[in-house]
């Protein structure tokens, strides 16, 4: 494992982002980036020296863009934009998301389209490397003109203002700068705007959600396979020939996952020739459902891969031609739509899992004891655990409502159509919490269902999952305090302990 990575601006992959964050690597900017960064900054300096009027350099902002600012006030202008825009509210974003925001902002500014000094980029790198994380409230951005409010909070510590977190402790920005070997910066022309303009918060929130959603996808394949066995379901619907006729590669891949997980199940062989003709859709149609989920996640990944390297500042500096152009790359519509698609996928993961829990606890379908407990009546078993799953699934349906169709004009109608990308991405994390809860309950219910098939065993692959669950949660022979069991399995899920890759590598 390397302790640092060389950042080639504009060349981050999703895999490299995961590796950088998971391994806590520090960042070293490739020297090849220095020339363009410096040329871009000199292009801005030339505008000032030639007394030209260019938006963002020597004008007001938003609907105040027509007001020209004198040269002796330009530094104050850049400081003011950071201070005035730092008006967020809500819970602070977690450190792992802030680390990703810093990485994306460094990657953005280092490509040489923003006109900032190398010194400013190096200051952001120092914060990232020393794990000094600015305190960023979660609410305040509408996803155009970029993530202005949260990025203002990201920028405050560079001025010696606000607070930061380091090793979980809240400290002053001044203390944080010292830890990173920095002193407060005096921003030069365009630098405040360059820090604030951009979609790094929306992108980081969406990327973080995507990475966790990949884990939930794998867990859902596993828990769904366990439910098939616990409910004495059939593996025939996972036959490759069926899925080849449909032609969707994601569905074909999902079906293969179910086949591999269920292969060798003694439980399946014991009822292969029973009278049940077909299983309910939540069992039988899992490849079709989860294939569609996988397809959406792949689309979201492709979109965010581009956005992680995208330039979303305004105006943009094209140093080679000496041009500074105003456009709208700060508009986060594509991130909002990607987040909406991921929300649909998360809702379907949780919704289908909730239906399988309902099947397992229904003795008339599953043939298992009512609510998966002996002496039902005296014991309620999984009756109310299913209610919790239903509550979370229903919550997800409301949260899945598209945010990209919403817009409210801001800045005196200068910014008259906004994307809501930040809220679209932020709500994914609430959906992740709901979905991981549902999957934890399904894993518990399916493993409890397996108890009633003994001495028959599930497949070798699924037995590893069963043993992992039982290592922290014993079987239910009577009612007990249920919530801690859900939390134990939920933690295992989010710690990536129920992974298809893990099973393959064992």
Curated annotation (Swiss-Prot):
It catalyses: L-histidine = trans-urocanate + NH4(+). One of its GO terms (molecular function) is histidine ammonia-lyase activity. It is found in: Cytoplasm. Contains an active site 4-methylidene-imidazol-5-one (MIO), which is formed autocatalytically by cyclization and dehydration of residues Ala-Ser-Gly. Pathway: Amino-acid degradation; L-histidine degradation into L-glutamate; N-formimidoyl-L-glutamate from L-histidine: step 1/3. Coiled coil: none annotated. The keyword Cytoplasm applies. Its EC number is 4.3.1.3. One of its GO terms (cellular component) is cytoplasm. There is a cross-link at residues 144-146 (5-imidazolinone (Ala-Gly)). One of its GO terms (biological process) is L-histidine catabolic process to glutamate and formamide. InterPro entries: Aromatic_Lyase, Fumarase/histidase_N, HutH, L-Aspartase-like, Phe/His_NH3-lyase_AS. It is an enzyme of class 4 (lyase). HAMAP family: His_ammonia_lyase (MF_00229). PANTHER family: HISTIDINE AMMONIA-LYASE. Belongs to the PAL/histidase family. This is Histidine ammonia-lyase. It comes from Legionella pneumophila (strain Lens).
